[in-house]
Amino acid sequence: MAEKIRVGLFFGGNSSEHDVSKRSAKNYYDALDPEKYQIFPVLISKKGIMIDSETSKRVLFGEDEDELLAGLPNKNADIFGPIDSIRNLKLDVLFPSVHGNLGEDGTLAGLFRLMNIPYVGSGLRAHAISFDKVITKELMTVNGIRNTKYIVIFQNDKNKPDWDSVSKQLGEVVFVKAANQGSSVGVSRVTNAEEYENALRDSFQYDEKLLVEKAVESPTELEIGLLGNDRVITSPIGAHWAPGQDHGSGWFDYKNKFVDNSKMKYQIPAKISPAKSKELENMAVKAYKVLGIKGFARIDFLMSKDGEIFLSEPNTLPGNTNMSLFPILFEAAGMNRSQQAEKLIQLAFEEFKREQNISYSFKELGSEKLGQFDIKK
């Protein structure tokens, strides 16, 4: 009998999506075949500390996290603690299910690469670029991928644009967003000067850089899942809208996404024309490659009333809860959650093998003589 593949399943983190991450990770745990995989859960606490696998498993299976972690020493608060903990588990592949900070921003991917162990998903660079809404939009614009008009405001700007200036540039309805947050944290819909000032104060709590973008009037919210490294497969396109709203009448705040999502409305496949479906798919694949994403992603789009499609934002560590769109989209294509998890691990090994063939060092011509100088008088 072949040895089981040892999987480190990372979840939690210090973002607002800590509990969502638990639900995602538990579904991955349940999806992976126990005859083939031995899974070692690794919790990252709300303080950003890596917890031992035995305690982590108890949290994953529903025991009270705060009670279990009370009094535990902060022994993993330095860089060597987490590395030693992971190495001691002798893991074959690392599977992050940490949303928001530490996960989607590339922190864990950087640690995993430093350890030279295969891991699921994108590398540090793709995560970090995709997590920053401003950099993402700048890259999309340069590469001809349609997105909404925007401006950028920094906290230390001495002359921040007032509402009159913003509304003249972007229109009477805008969104103010913290550049490096997920799950609609630090996001406000703004229609007047008072709301604008309040939105700036709120969003600057979460980031020193803000994105202010033109709203798409009554948009259809669309999304597509992507799986792959260099070769990418796409899911059917889905449409969704929030509880209590008509199709195309609202936007998703944190409450819609995580507190009251049991009544979320879906339409898979979305009722858009074949031509628009192809256009969106092409935009998604191009964005995936421009951003350097590996493994998987969900990319969100907005379609205006006149059929114009705008890329909204990518998600490089999409959720895996019962209500998460990425797994639902691929289930609609006939790929169940076990097959999805298996594919992600396969892609992790493939990408690791590819990276091992890349040389990151070189011997400069004549470098053996560096430091030797022939000084002529």
UniProtKB/Swiss-Prot annotation:
Domain ATP-grasp: 137-346
CC terms in the record's Gene Ontology section: cytosol
Subcellular location: Cytoplasm
List of residues binding Mg(2+) 1: D300, E313
Record note on cofactor: Binds 2 magnesium or manganese ions per subunit.
Enzyme class (EC, first level): ligase
Single GO biological process annotation from the record: peptidoglycan biosynthetic process
Protein name: D-alanine--D-alanine ligase
Naturally occurring in which organism (per UniProt): Oenococcus oeni (strain ATCC BAA-331 / PSU-1)
